[in-house]
């Protein structure tokens, strides 16, 4: 009976799949000055993450910084970039000055 209860707890409290709406766009916009700035910054970071995986595959480890948040195997680089922004792993203010 204990195994059944443990299984039910895992099913009931299982984390839902995250998608493009998680993190919520409103919280992302509060970290950025504008929609345009958020889109540009997230796209640049997604390209860096893609390049990191390419470099990793080719054996070069130090050219780009990899993901700063936990990543699932099926996560897209843009989703990872958005999560990094939502969790304050990146400084959007300094990038606006560049």
From Swiss-Prot:
One of its GO terms (molecular function) is DNA binding. The keyword Nucleotidyltransferase applies. It catalyses: RNA(n) + a ribonucleoside 5'-triphosphate = RNA(n+1) + diphosphate. Its EC number is 2.7.7.6. HAMAP family: RNApol_bact_RpoZ. Coiled coil: none annotated. Promotes RNA polymerase assembly. Latches the N- and C-terminal regions of the beta' subunit thereby facilitating its interaction with the beta and alpha subunits. Pfam families: RNA_pol_Rpb6. NCBIfam families: rpoZ. Belongs to the RNA polymerase subunit omega family. The RNAP catalytic core consists of 2 alpha, 1 beta, 1 beta' and 1 omega subunit. When a sigma factor is associated with the core the holoenzyme is formed, which can initiate transcription. GO terms for biological process: DNA-templated transcription. Keywords: DNA-directed RNA polymerase, Nucleotidyltransferase, Transcription, Transferase. This is DNA-directed RNA polymerase subunit omega. One of its GO terms (cellular component) is DNA-directed RNA polymerase complex.
